[in-house]
């Protein structure tokens, strides 16, 4: 953003603030008789001056998440409820097929004791568990960060590495490929098995599929939501004995339509042989 662009941005900001100030003044003049509607000012995507998030159209960002500033989110990735990705003083990059689960925090480092500037780089097909904290670190492809883990400035988790739940990984630590680290401070625990390495990729795939269902549900307009409420009320099931006493035969409720890759394939029921 050049000098002229920043000037226009500042003027627009002042005009908006003036309007809000006039609204507050009018409310005070009305005394106890005024009505003020409480609106949430939460923004899922928010710029910081000229730094704006870039989110792939195939990615899912939950409505209650906050993606702020210089953040790039790749194809098929999912940012879940309550997450904060804050790229205000540096860059946050999230690859493809990665999931950052509920209430996690991803931030960047502009200054620290070592004097180094660290962006946060998260690779492809990474799983980051609930309430994890990533600060100025690098997480390579197909890694697993457990719930509540904390990764500090300069940490590097190599491909197929795993950080256990609740671990605290100190600054400038490097976790080699195929190893599990845990504890406070985190230290080497053991090698991953082949099955565990395969699980890392499968976990990312499962979350990408699940995100499609959440994206479809969150995209529904109000009229569709209200119509589905009526349908659910209509098809509410009561106790079979209660229905039989009243002689009621209820309609079978419709099945919830999910993408084919969300639920495991159901075996087709074969008709019983007729003797």
Curated annotation (Swiss-Prot):
UniProt-listed Enzyme Commission number(s) = 4.2.1.-
Q: Which gene encodes it?
A: GAMMACA1
Query: What Gene3D superfamilies does UniProt report for this protein, alphabetically?
Result: Hexapeptide repeat proteins
Q: What is this protein called?
A: Gamma carbonic anhydrase 1, mitochondrial
Transit peptide extent? 1-43
Task performed by this protein: Enzyme involved in the catabolism of H(2)CO(3) but that does not mediates the reversible hydration of carbon dioxide. Mediates complex I assembly in mitochondria and respiration.
Cite the PANTHER family for this sequence. Answer: DYNACTIN SUBUNIT P25, GAMMA CARBONIC ANHYDRASE 1, MITOCHONDRIAL
Residues that bind substrate: 86-88, 101-102, 209
Q: Which residues form a coiled coil?
A: none
Asked whether the UniProt record includes Transit peptide among its keywords, one would answer: yes
List the cofactors: Zn(2+)
Ranked from the top, the taxonomy reads: Eukaryota, Viridiplantae, Streptophyta, Embryophyta, Tracheophyta
Q: Which GO terms describe its cellular component?
A: mitochondrial membrane; mitochondrion; nucleus; respiratory chain complex I
List localization entries: Mitochondrion membrane
Q: Which stretches does UniProt call biased (Basic and acidic residues)? A: 264-275
Q: Which organism is it from?
A: Arabidopsis thaliana (Mouse-ear cress)
Q: Quaternary form? A: Homotrimer. Component of the mitochondrial oxidoreductase respiratory chain complex I; element of the extra matrix-exposed domain, which is attached to the membrane arm of this complex.
Q: Which family does the record assign? A: Belongs to the gamma-class carbonic anhydrase family.
